Each structure stands twice: as structure tokens, then as C-alpha cells.
């Protein structure tokens, strides 16, 4: 079976793709096919031109696509932050001087450089997840897949992680695939995919997808508060664009509507 995302179209390099859906819809199963944690029962999954079922290419596939999981404690293997980030490149046989540079660059990229000598258990959940992301970045992948990375975090931790991955995409040109069931985490994505029962039921910009009220209701998904407000105002007779996302865009749209 081919990946439903691959069957639709591949993420563009440097883009931010969010995959949204309820538990059991298949989004985490999809994520695990990207770097060959799971293999297709039939057909093939191609990652950067490499077939994931080819054992000789397994290391190369995982160097191209890094994975970040729900629980950062399951990815942290060392007692010092910088040693943990160095773990993957060391196993890849990267030269010591190069490892030092990669570790420093990765920790700076996620805003955790000042914590490089800390013990991971002294960090908050959001900080631990950022260290886990740094560990993936040290492998210098072309794509990072995050499988519900904020599921075990408090609101502050969630904001830290989403802000970090968004910045990596925008400033570093890294492809990001975010698996989530939080609607608000998808607002800044370039592309939003809704999955249900193992299939894609919608694929477009967040503005277009969230504006489809019938789809969201059918899938039992709650749209962002700003989108719901715009829909309610439109039903009340105001002429405005229901595709505006985010507080600032929503405020501008309402202000423009009130002038007419």
C-alpha cells in the first residue's frame, strides 16, 4: 500500500505540512512510514527517491527524515543535554570536530544552547522536546516529522515546540511534517491535510480547509475560535472573509466589515 500522502502529492522542500485527524485516523501510522519505522504490507513507499523496504537504504532514509515522538523521555538517552544531542551523529561516524559544531548549531536553533550542560531531568516538558528536536537536527535531515510532539505538554510547552518547528521551517528551509489533533497548531502551516479512516478527506491551505464548515462538522473537528467567530458574524449578515486565520487577521477582517 502506498502512503496516502505520497499518493496525493509529496511535500515541497522547505514547506510546513500539518496532518490533522482524530485518534485512530491513521496519521501516526502514516508518519511511521516516512522513515521506515513501519513498512508497507504491499506496494512501496518512496522517500527522496529511496524505497523504504530496501534494507541497504534504511540508514540513508533515516538520515534524510528525522522523527520526533510524543514523549521526549523516550528519545533522550544521555544524562547531559549536549551528550544526548551528540548521540546520533556519533553513531553515524561523524568526526568529533564536526559533531561539536553540529551539537552547538542544533541547540542554538532550538533555543537550548544555554542548557547544554544541564541534566535532561531538570528541564520542563517543552524544553525536553526541544532537546529531542535538536538531536534530530544534529543528523542534518532534509525533513523532520513530528508525531504529536505536544501531546504530553502543557500549553506553554506546546507553544515553545510549535514556535520552534515553525522557525526551523521558515528560517532554515527545512521541510516539516506535523502530526497533530490540535487545530490551533495547524494555523501557521502551508498545507493542511485532514485524515479519516486511513484516507485523506481534505488537502489544502489551512484557510481553505477550515472554511469548509460542513467538512469540519462531518469529521467532528472544532475549527479555531477566530474561524468560528467569522462564520457566526457572516450568518448574522456581515460581509467578511471566513478564511482569515489568526487573531490579527480576524481583527482586520472584522474592522473592515464594520466600516461598510
Report the location of each language-model feature.
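Conserved ABC transporter NBD signature motif
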Residues: 43-53, 61
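Helix-to-loop junction immediately C-terminal to a conserved catalytic motif
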Residues: 35
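The feature captures the beta-strand-to-loop junction immediately N-terminal to the Walker
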Residues: 20-22
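Conserved ABC ATPase "signature" region
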Residues: 97-115
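Conserved ABC ATPase signature
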Residues: 119-123, 127
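Catalytic Walker B motif of ABC-type/P-loop ATPase nucleotide-binding domains
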Residues: 144-147
Amino acid at each position: 500500500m502506498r502512503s496516502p500522502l505520497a499518493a496525493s502529492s509529496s511535500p515541497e522542500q522547505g514547506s510546513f505540512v500539518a496532518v490533522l485527524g482524530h485518534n485512530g485516523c491513521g496519521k501516526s501510522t502514516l508518519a511511521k512510514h516516512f522513515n521506515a519505522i513501519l513498512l508497507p504490507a504491499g506496494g512501496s513507499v518512496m522517500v527522496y527517491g529511496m524505497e523504504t523496504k530496501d534494507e541497504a537504504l534504511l540508514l540513508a532514509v533515516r538520515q534524510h527524515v528525522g522523527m520526533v515522538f510524543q514523549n521526549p523521555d523516550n528519545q533522550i538517552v544521555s544524562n547531559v543535554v549536549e551528550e544526548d544531542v551528540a548521540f546520533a551523529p556519533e553513531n553515524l561516524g561523524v568526526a568529533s570536530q564536526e559533531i561539536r559544531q553540529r551539537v552547538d548549531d542544533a541547540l542554538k536553533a532550538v533555543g537550548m544552547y544555554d542548557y547544554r550542560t544541564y541534566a535532561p531531568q531538570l528541564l520542563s516538558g517543552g524544553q525536553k522536546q526541544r532537546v529531542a528536536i535538536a538531536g534530530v537536527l544534529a543528523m542534518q535531515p532534509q525533513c523532520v516529522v513530528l508525531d504529536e510532539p505536544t501531546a504530553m505538554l502543557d500549553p506553554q510547552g506546546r507553544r515553545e515546540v510549535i514556535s520552534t518547528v515553525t522557525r526551523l521551517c521558515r528560517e532554515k528551509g527545512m521541510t516539516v511534517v506535523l502530526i497533530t489533533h490540535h487545530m490551533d497548531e495547524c494555523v501557521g502551516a502551508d498545507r493542511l491535510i485532514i485524515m479519516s479512516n486511513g484516507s485523506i478527506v481534505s488537502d489544502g491551505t489551512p484557510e481553505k480547509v477550515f472554511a469548509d464548515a460542513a467538512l469540519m462538522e462531518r469529521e467532528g473537528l472544532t475549527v479555531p475560535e477566530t474561524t468560528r467567530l467569522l462564520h457566526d458574524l457572516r450568518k448574522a449578515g456581515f460581509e467578511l472573509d471566513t478564511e482569515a486565520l489568526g487573531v490579527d487577521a480576524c481583527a482586520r477582517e472584522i474592522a473592515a466589515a464594520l466600516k461598510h
